[in-house]
């Protein structure tokens, strides 16, 4: 019974495993030109559905509630979309001389280029008791920013423009991401009261569509006889991903707790999660667009598929520790305040 409850709670993680397993059993169903017609249903309909859903669920006022804390927002966005991908690129120059599969290494670079997720960083910040408003703003703002910045970073670091025209990427992104998002926000204005009363399962809808995208991505993988992935590379990539997450969490903690940083303990909590988490919901559709038709798309996507559950699991494990630190630091601040 406890196992069933756990499966129900972690249904998306289980769904990823099932989707990959189903793709392995019968990859012909989800390949381009197959019965599911992913070149239409995934590339356009599924991606547009995810972002229309995001437009419906995202409260516009959340983007302005924490707008005044410019220093915090600048720190998070620069770390996420500049420092993170650049550091990963430098690190990969060292790893390029190893025997690790080159497409997995390219996948690690794509992880660095991704924007923050809309949900997980906010959920963990709230669980700790950190600055939730800042987490909401930066997750939402970072997602919007990522629509433009992430494709540019992918083209810059991976040079995929040789196979996919730059204008083609942005036209498809505009039609499948920006337009549905804006339409979702417009529709939300007219049914706002109903949405707040009924609270539709937006997260479940987006995650379900995302599982379809993951399934068709791996159908392409398993139907390609040229792909060869050794277990050593896979295990090593998992170790590298966890090491990257821990290292960057420690870095953001050190930077944001300096005496002259100007950040509160609650701000630091939001910074730790928002600066180091990467979006799977935005990432996979973007990779599908930027690397459309690429024979190694699934290998490029694999590090992000590993990074996403790893960041949630690692963050969940660290919640009690970070919460204990924040509470003790806040008590210390109160005790050191001069009495009037």
Curated annotation (Swiss-Prot):
Membrane topology: Multi-pass membrane protein
Keyword Repeat: no
Cellular component aspect of the GO annotation: endoplasmic reticulum; endoplasmic reticulum membrane; Golgi apparatus; Golgi membrane; plasma membrane
One GO term of the biological process aspect: heparin proteoglycan biosynthetic process
Extracellular topological intervals: 32-37, 93-116, 160-163, 223-234, 292-298
Tissues/organs with expression: Strongly expressed in liver, adrenal gland, small intestine and colon. Moderately expressed in heart, lung, kidney and spleen. Weakly expressed in brain.
Residue numbers on the Cytoplasmic membrane side: 1-10, 59-71, 138, 185-201, 256-270, 320-340
Any one GO molecular-function label of the UniProt entry: symporter activity
Keyword hit for Zinc-finger: no
Disulfide pattern: none
TM spans (from-to): 11-31, 38-58, 72-92, 117-137, 139-159, 164-184, 202-222, 235-255, 271-291, 299-319
Subcellular localization, as worded in the UniProt entry: Cell membrane; Endoplasmic reticulum membrane; Golgi apparatus membrane
Sequence similarity: Belongs to the bile acid:sodium symporter (BASS) (TC 2.A.28) family.
PANTHER family given in the database record: SODIUM_BILE ACID COTRANSPORTER 7 (PTHR18640:SF5), SOLUTE CARRIER FAMILY 10 MEMBER 7 (PTHR18640)
Function: Involved in teeth and skeletal development. Has an essential role in the biosynthesis and trafficking of glycosaminoglycans and glycoproteins to produce a proper functioning extracellular matrix. Required for extracellular matrix mineralization. Also involved in the regulation of cellular calcium homeostasis. Does not show transport activity towards bile acids or steroid sulfates (including taurocholate, cholate, chenodeoxycholate, estrone-3-sulfate, dehydroepiandrosterone sulfate (DHEAS) and pregnenolone sulfate).
Protein name: Sodium/bile acid cotransporter 7
Organism: Rattus norvegicus
Name of the gene encoding the protein in the UniProt record: Slc10a7
